[in-house]
Amino acid sequence: IRYGEVGGVPVEGYLVRPKAARGRLPGLIVIHEWWGLNDNVRDEAARLAAEGFVVLAVDLYAGKVATQPPDAMKLAQALTANPGPAEENLRAAYAWLDEVEKAPRIGTVGWCLGGRWSLRTALLLPDQVDATVIYYGTVKADEGVLARLQMPILGLFASQDRVVPAATVTAFEATLKRLGKDADIHMYEGADHGFANPSGTAYEP
């Protein structure tokens, strides 16, 4: 579905609603890993929609999908170097769920790179996003930044993750608690980065 424009260029994503759904449903912005909007993310979007959400899986790579780590790294680095278009993209996704789908509540969820952007979306729209879920996304214990968060935060991390070390997660959690935020941070012992990806080698069902 085409859900907005970034720099005058249309952006498309994957929209899923529960079968036989009626009325207004809570919305969920789903943000892909560093691979891009691939079949695994579409499957996750469908699974989440079956729980009663209208789900919009965004595409931050303008249609590009990587299958090898070096290619994924290039796409992720380009996104980090120029985050403005991604921010505009995610604002458009929120606006679609809010204005077109009339979702009464809207949350964000993402894995890996998408986990970082799930948190970033919550920081972009702190008075609008109603909940944010971070699966092993890069986080920082910056009080000045995290103070803006106004919604419940769920963080799911892995003890063996070298991308997002346990010490970083501990500092992040401590900062959220010090700020009095509604945060639920889980550290899965023995798990590694990517543990929630059924198509990956680190999957822990």
Ranges and model annotations:
Residues L149, G155-F157, D161:
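Short beta-strand/loop motif that positions the catalytic acidic residue
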Residues Q160-V164, H193:
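Acidic catalytic loop of the alpha/beta-hydrolase fold
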Residues D59, V109-W111, V133-Y136, L156, ...:
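Alpha/beta-hydrolase-fold catalytic nucleophile elbow
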Residues I1-V100, G194-G200:
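Serine-hydrolase catalytic machinery in alpha/beta-hydrolase-like enzymes
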Residues L90-Q150:
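Primarily recognizes the serine-hydrolase "nucleophile elbow" in alpha/beta-hydrolase
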Residues E44, P165-T175, D184:
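Short alpha-helix in the alpha/beta-hydrolase fold that links the catalytic acid
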Residues K177-P205:
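C-terminal catalytic histidine-bearing segment of alpha/beta-hydrolase fold enzymes
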